[in-house]
């Protein structure tokens, strides 16, 4: 487990367990909404805070489900893109709409 997820557990795990998985999920979704708002509004000064909040709530959710974010991320992406196995990804993607 990475040090960030461990630190979030030290600070919040007991409180998050008491809130439960569903309640914690709602907080996570709210934080994702705040991040989306900051990105859409171009609020550069809020991005660090909102990214950190989303990362913390994601770490908490993983912990509540008994998952190690670092391990599952490394496992899924160890061989590059999970679909084409290339690094960088060589999957055909439509051009982004601007």
How would you describe each model-predicted region?
Residues 1-51, 55-98:
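Flexible "arm" and connector segments at domain edges
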């Amino acid at each position: 487990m990475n040090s960030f997820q461990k630190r979030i557990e030290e600070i919040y795990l007991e409180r998050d367990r008491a809130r439960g998985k569903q309640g914690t999920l709602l907080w996570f979704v709210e934080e994702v909404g705040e991040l989306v708002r900051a990105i859409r509004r171009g609020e550069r000064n809020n991005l660090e805070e909102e990214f950190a909040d989303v990362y913390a709530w994601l770490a908490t959710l993983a912990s509540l489900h008994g998952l190690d974010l670092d391990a599952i991320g490394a496992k899924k992406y160890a061989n590059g893109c999970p679909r084409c196995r290339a690094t960088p990804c060589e999957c055909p993607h439509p051009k982004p709409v601007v």
